[in-house]
Amino acid sequence: MNLYEFTFIAQQGLLQQEVEGMAQELGVSLKNIKADIMFQQIKGILEKGSDKFTKRDSEMHAKDIQENLIAYSSFLESFAKILWIELEEDLSNLKEVKLKISKELKDDLKGLGIAQGFIKLPEGGKQIAKNAFIHNAVSALKEDISKHLIKIFQGILQNFGMAEPNQSNKTLEMLLDNIEASGLIKYEYWGLLDFAYPINKMKSGHYCIMCISSTSNIMDEFVRRIKLNENIIRHLSVHVDKFFEGKSHMMNKQVEEQSA
């Protein structure tokens, strides 16, 4: 699970709500990219595993596996977002956050057959950073998910001559890499700000930062598509260890300047 702070500058002619809408659309784009990568990865594995099936057969089975992966992935997204947004830095409100997860994701937990025992503090009262705690919780949940998915996969993989336990486990492990990518966790609009020098003859632009949990291959494709977006004139992707809590440094600085 990689964390990124992705900052983009949108054209000055847009309205604030249009820029914020763009950030949300980019979040949807991350979901779609993940689904596309999953499908292509699954199809490639199936096609290499057997030459007895047509391209249509491979695509049909790949779609079945993809749908199961997306269901679990969507749950992981919701789970991770609650932890990142609601959990205090010192984990002091963990009990309340666990109740929120149980309440909001109750139907998903039941429908996906997931037991609620994956959010645990370190033994012996050891201190742990919030980002490390979330990573451990997501990894534990991912392991629980893999136990359910292997049962689904084995039947499909058997048709492709890939039902050996070790081979099935390796295939599943490869496919599970992308489901940890939670996508857009939160975003922050910084406002219409002046440039130090003109960019494409423009003197100002709308600044927005997105906090993203993703994999490198998903982010590579995301950035490639960003470059095709005519409304975005500049962008910067930075790999970080953790997301900022509350407001970003940029927003706090703006508040200080306005108060001075």
UniProtKB/Swiss-Prot annotation:
Q: Does the keyword Ribonucleoprotein apply?
A: yes
Q: Which domain of life is it from?
A: Bacteria
Q: Which GO terms describe its biological process?
A: translation
Q: Which UniProt keywords apply?
A: Ribonucleoprotein, Ribosomal protein, RNA-binding, rRNA-binding
- What are the record's GO terms for cellular component? ribonucleoprotein complex; ribosome
Give the matching InterPro entries.
Ribosomal_bS6, Ribosomal_bS6_sf, Ribosomal_S6_plastid/chlpt, Transl_elong_EF1B/ribsomal_bS6
Q: Which residues form the signal peptide?
A: none
The keyword Cytoplasm belongs to this UniProt entry's keyword annotation: no
Q: Which GO terms describe its molecular function?
A: rRNA binding; structural constituent of ribosome
Q: What does this protein do?
A: Binds together with bS18 to 16S ribosomal RNA.
Protein family (similarity comment): Belongs to the bacterial ribosomal protein bS6 family.
The cross-references to NCBIfam families, in alphabetical order and at most eight, read:
S6 (TIGR00166)
**What is the official name of this protein in its record?**
Small ribosomal subunit protein bS6
Q: Which organism is it from?
A: Wolbachia sp. subsp. Brugia malayi (strain TRS)
Upper lineage is: Bacteria, Pseudomonadati, Pseudomonadota, Alphaproteobacteria, Rickettsiales
